[in-house]
């Protein structure tokens, strides 16, 4: 990824609409859905089991936004950045998908969230899935408690 994404971003002005698959794994969706290993029900026509293809233009936009964050922002309002304590990879479902982020690199979130501004509260959620509030009840209850406590400390 450290070479492919910048390369895709470089060719985007010339080939903005090339469709790129994101993979063929349904493992994360299986972690959420009650019919597999999760506890949730949702419309699979709206929240797909497989991630849809993206375009070179989309990848370039994400990469450029990430570079902006890497270089630092100066957000003046309080920011709460929450992320799991580990990332999970793989094409086949395993129990690890129930306790980690199968979408994002949590090390990058931990590293770069501090670049958002001067009033950043970060929460590393032990055992959190990508959708933290879809994690197991004990995990999401900890997240809710933290969010409400944090909200009570900020003034709008």
Outline where the language-model segments fall.
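Alpha/beta-hydrolase-fold enzymes
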Residues: 1-54
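Conserved active-site and cofactor/substrate-binding residues in soluble primary-metabolism enzymes
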Residues: 53, 57, 104-107, 142
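Short beta-strand/loop motif that positions the catalytic acidic residue
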Residues: 75, 81-83, 96-97
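Acidic beta-to-alpha connecting loop that harbors the catalytic carboxylate
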Residues: 85-88, 100, 128-129
């Amino acid at each position: 990824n450290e070479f492919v994404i910048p390369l895709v971003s470089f060719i985007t002005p010339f080939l903005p609409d090339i469709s790129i698959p994101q993979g063929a794994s349904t493992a994360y969706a299986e972690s959420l859905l009650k019919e597999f290993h999760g506890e949730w029900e949702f419309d699979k026509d709206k929240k797909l089991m497989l991630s849809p293809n993206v375009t070179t233009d989309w990848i370039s936009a994400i990469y450029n936004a990430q570079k902006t964050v890497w270089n630092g922002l100066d957000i003046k309002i309080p920011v709460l950045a929450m992320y799991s304590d580990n990332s999970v990879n793989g094409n086949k479902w395993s129990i690890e998908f129930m306790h980690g982020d199968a979408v994002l690199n949590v090390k990058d979130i931990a590293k770069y969230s501090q670049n958002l501004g001067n009033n950043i509260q970060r929460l590393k959620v032990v055992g959190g899935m990508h959708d933290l509030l879809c994690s197991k009840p004990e995990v999401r209850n900890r997240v809710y408690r933290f969010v409400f406590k944090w909200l009570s400390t900020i003034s709008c």
